[in-house]
Amino acid sequence: GTLLLGSTRLSDYDHAFPFKDGTMNQSSGLLFARGQKNISITGFGTIDGQGGDKAFQFGNDADGGPKRPKIIYFVECCDIVVTDVTLRNSAYWVQHYEKCEDVTIRGLKVFSHCNYNNDGLDIDAKNATISDCYIDVEDDAICFKSDHPEFCENITVTNCVTASNCNAIKFGTASHGGYRNIAVSNCVVRRAAEDNIRHWSKQLEHISADVTVISGVAIEM
């Protein structure tokens, strides 16, 4: 498949804009869209953000994380389909769907352990399905966001394998609008393949291997 490499020049990423609710966006993305519809990224190619390059070494989020580009960043878009691609080596979050509607994410392979805040999938959306994905990342694997007054709602996550040095599945930290009608089922939580940045990876504590606390979720001890 085709290999698409992200630029390592920060000057190529400049998407600052205000939201209607008064907040200011400072993030950018290799693949960026705002206010668009009928977007598809499909096929079996690889998108590599080259996020380990020295141009993106600013430290963690508090020290300028949003200056680093994401690989996919869609804002206020609808009818989005992202299937079967491989996403690697993001400088920041791998993919972020903010204030989006009608999103289908299926069959992705996500691997990113090259920088701080390497979340695998951050979704702040309505009416979304996420399925059959393999996500192995340094920070949160799948993270639900609610960064604006609207609910993050009507989302299903199923048949995914997540591996993370932080949180496999997380709600927040941005939790302004809240969450509603979100289902996570038949997922596997594994240890991350690498632990390059914060060295958070360790055995789960106070959990017995013979205790299942969430139906349909397997945890590798």
Model-based region annotation:
Residues 1-221:
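Extracellular/periplasmic carbohydrate-active domains that bind, remodel
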